[in-house]
Structure formats: C-alpha cells, structure tokens
C-alpha cells in the first residue's frame, strides 16, 4: 500500500499493489476508521498460541548476550519509552522487550533508516519529560547521527543510550552471509570504542558484565 499526494511518486521505486493518491491526513483518517471497525480478538488468540508453541530462548552459558541486556532493561525501566535504531538490536528489542502500555515503543520497521534511533529518542524525551527514554542502537547506526549528542545537551534531553557495539554493520553482514555467499564488503568497522560522549557533556561507560549494565 503506497499513499502519496504526488501521482508521479506512486510506484516510482517499487511497484505497489495498492496505490492511494491522497493527502496523508485524509488517508490515515480513513485507515483508522477501517482498523477500528475490525474485530481482532481471534487474531490475538492466534498470536498467543504462536507464543506458546515458540517460546523465546536465552543462553546463559556464554557471558553477556543481547537477550540478557533486555532482561535487565525489563526489570529496571517498566514505564520507560523505548526507541530503537535499525539493525539486529531492533530485532532483539521487538522480541524481548516487555511492554506494559500503548505507545511505549518507537521504531522504524522495514524502512532501513539507520540513524533513526537517537534523534527519535531526543524527540521522545522532549515530548515525555516525566519519563525515562531508552534508545537501543548499534555502533553503525549511532555513528550516522552521533553529532546529535550536542542537540541532546543543548535541549536538556537526557536520553539513556544502550549501544550494542559488535564492530560490524551486523544486519548488513548477516544479509551478506545468508544471501550473498559470505562475500563480506564494507561491514567490518574494526575494533574500536564508540564512546565519544564524555567529551560532549553526557557520561558513557562500557560495562564488562551483565550485572554492571544497569
């Protein structure tokens, strides 16, 4: 489904199944009316059954894992607003975060917008001054808008950044592994610390163990 006010933009990059030429506000109003009229009870039951048949697993015999990080986040920030960047950490977040309310998770799904997380988290904090805002990002995505640390300081928007630093563009490398015969290109960021925050005002640390994370 492609909604665009400009007819020339429809199917310009990707051929779409359902083209809708409309102002976004009008189209979204109609979509909301349609969505609210649907009974989702059966669909929710099916999802609950899938969860029972395919429970999430977590290894505990190999040091700190991404899954353990989210386990600790769930215990500590129950009412926080969570924001993800785009990458492997985004997949982990959507699987392992436990959400207690609507509008608690902000993510850019399926759009490949690396660098989205940190600026979006700053905006979420400005709009929710009374809540903690936790941004999950990777070393690749964070570097795309790393300059926004200065914005966060100037706007007095303290955001908690949880940075998964594996020295790779992890999801791109995974695609190269699965679909391109392990021909890796431009995905290794080499081993270095991505901790320039201390020179700009915020505090940064690299915890070696899971209990030290929080």
Task: Please report, for each region that a protein language model flagged, where it lies by residue.
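Short glycine/proline-enriched coil/turn segments at helix->beta-strand junctions
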Residues: 36-37, 77-79, 129
